[in-house]
Amino acid sequence: MISFSEATRFTPEKYEETRVWCKEHGHPLPKYLLYPRTKGFVSTVQHLRQAEHVKAVYDICIAYQHRDIFMAAPDMLHTFILGKLTERHRYRFHAHVRRFELRDLPETDVELAKWLEQRWLEKGEWLAEQKERWSKGQKQS
């Protein structure tokens, strides 16, 4: 199961809405990301706790760049029709994956929502670090 907690595609307009919402509600603004919608994630995790075979939650963050434009993702059409996006078309991609044991996640809905918010802030920091590295021509970490 995959949960896209931003709930919509990132656009400059959506980021501005996120900035305003975070300011009005006293939440920190994640870098390069929309503020996560927590209800679906919280509900899913609470139900997955009941499944014996589910042991972990994976947090995946993908950084991408086209030529010199950070977080410029290829659209679906280009993904399917253009072969070798990285070599021929100068896209860069890097996925950062972390595993969190389900038993180690907070128990209450409120704390679980805060946990997700913290992951989002960490993702934003990681993306900022990737942008800095890539702008200097350094390898991913």
Question: Residues of each region from the PLM?
Answer:
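A cross-family acyltransferase "interaction/gating" segment
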Residues: 2-110
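Pan-eukaryotic secretory-pathway lumenal catalytic ectodomains of glycan-active enzymes
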Residues: 87-141
